[in-house]
Regions:
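Helix-loop-strand module that forms the ligand-binding subsite of alpha/beta enzymes
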Residues: 39-127
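A generic "alpha-helical surface" signal
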Residues: 13, 62, 102, 144, ...
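N-terminal beta1-alpha1 ligand-phosphate binding loop
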Residues: 2-29
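Short hydrophobic segments within beta-strands
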Residues: 7-9, 37, 90
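Residues at the starts of beta-strands that form the adenosine-phosphate
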Residues: 3, 33, 86
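A generic structural motif
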Residues: 29-35
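Glycine-rich phosphate/pyrophosphate-binding loop and the adjoining helix
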Residues: 120-190
């Protein structure tokens, strides 16, 4: 059974709300165990435990929060021992254009330095709304497309863990039995 950790830092509760939605998305794929943990309660054992990880951070000055960065800096003695995990990112920002995509890229860079395989999501969760670099929000996720982008990120992580860790090829995203585009986008294409 694949194991997914949704690890987040949340200052005002917005990133935590996103993390809960990401965890809901993970639960859409059967046979995947999920843990939801704030960075303040996590430790190195949680990182060793998981096969896949969704990292979430608020955007502070266009990048990762110092709390999230400090956690990974303190994990440096474990570098090269965590290689091969699957990772993705999500971030909240104060307003659109606040740098959440840059934060997701910074989170993925941290994971890449630890040898993780990282990905984005090409699905369209709403009109002109994707999670190529990870799920991003301005404030808390309120609109359906924002909620769905978090869930899709979690589901995609669970799919990749099922495929690469559990060997369940039928869980490949391209074989999914769900629409990879929103209703609005699908009807526009027809």
């Amino acid at each position: 059974m694949g194991k997914v950790l949704v690890l987040y830092h949340s200052q005002d509760g917005n990133t935590e709300k996103m993390a809960r939605l990401v965890a809901e998305g993970v639960c859409e794929i059967p046979g995947i165990e999920v843990r939801l943990k704030s960075i303040q309660k996590a430790n190195r054992d949680d990182i060793y435990w998981c096969d896949g990880i969704a990292l979430g951070s608020p955007t502070h000055f266009g990048t990762v929060s110092s709390t999230m960065k400090k956690f990974w800096e303190e994990l440096l003695p474990d570098w090269q021992k965590l290689d091969g995990k699957i990772g993705c990112a999500f971030s909240s920002q104060g307003s659109w254009g606040g740098g959440a995509e840059l934060t997701c890229q910074a989170l993925m860079t941290i994971m890449m330095n630890y040898g993780f395989l990282v990905f984005g999501v090409t699905d369209i969760s709403g009109h002109q709304f994707t999670a190529h670099y990870g799920a991003t929000q301005a404030g808390e996720p309120r609109e359906e497309k924002q909620i769905e982008s978090c869930r899709r990120l979690g589901r995609r992580l669970a799919e990749w863990v099922a495929v690469f860790i559990d060997g369940r090829k039928e869980s490949h995203p391209l074989l999914g039995k769900y629409s990879r585009h929103s209703e609005k986008e699908t009807s526009k294409e027809e």
